[in-house]
Design a protein with these regions (language model features):
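A generic structural signal for ordered alpha-helices
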Residues: 12-13, 20, 36, 48, ...
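N-terminal charged segments
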Residues: 1-30
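Feature targets compositionally biased, intrinsically disordered low-complexity regions
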Residues: 18, 27-30, 88, 142, ...
Length: 177
């Protein structure tokens, strides 16, 4: 019997994953629900989110570097659903690599060099400070910031900032020149 989470997904996603085993990833901090299949990953995100930019960037990166391939991207009134291919291997923060920095550092260095080698003249996604601050302002003004997962010294009585509004003001006033 199909579980209720899978049953609730859009048909375009469900047809790829129906009947397949998965685990739920609890590593990320994005607040998304991430289902890990043997050869695919499904990211379910509350809207609004930046998944459209991520999808556009993933499609643009295809063939340029090893990156997940977008299989299906769907949105409804509440969520966005990104089903992508799964890249096999360990993440850089895996215990294996953290205990073996002499293996990790060269891998990270090669990864940075690979990213730097990409010609970005036709890159469809612009992520500059002005755009990111505008998105942050929208999230703050519309009550879309969840501080429950923030570092303890960021907000509140013992924090550097009273609330997200104060942090946003500080970021706007202290932007690099």
């Amino acid at each position: 019997m199909m579980d209720s989470l899978i049953q609730s997904l859009p048909e375009a996603i469900r047809k790829h994953i129906e009947g397949r085993e998965y685990t739920i990833d609890d590593m990320g901090k994005s607040g998304s629900k991430v289902l890990i299949f043997e050869d695919m990953v499904l990211k379910i995100t509350d809207k609004p989110c930046d998944d459209k930019d991520a999808v556009e960037m993933m499609r643009w990166l295809e063939g340029k570097i090893p990156a997940p391939r977008v299989i299906v991207f769907e949105e409804d009134d509440s969520y966005s659903y990104l089903l992508m291919s799964r890249i096999m291997g360990k993440i850089a923060c895996d215990k294996y690599y953290l205990e073996r920095p002499k293996e990790l550092v060269p891998l990270l260095s090669r990864s940075v060099k690979m990213l730097q080698s990409i010609d970005i003249t036709d890159c469809p996604v612009i992520k500059d400070l002005d755009r990111e601050l505008k998105k942050a302002a929208y999230r703050v003004e519309n009550g879309l910031v969840d501080i429950s997962d923030a570092e303890p010294d960021t907000f509140g009585e013992n924090g550097r900032f009273k609330d997200p509004e104060e942090l946003l003001s500080w970021l706007q006033e202290n932007r690099p020149s």
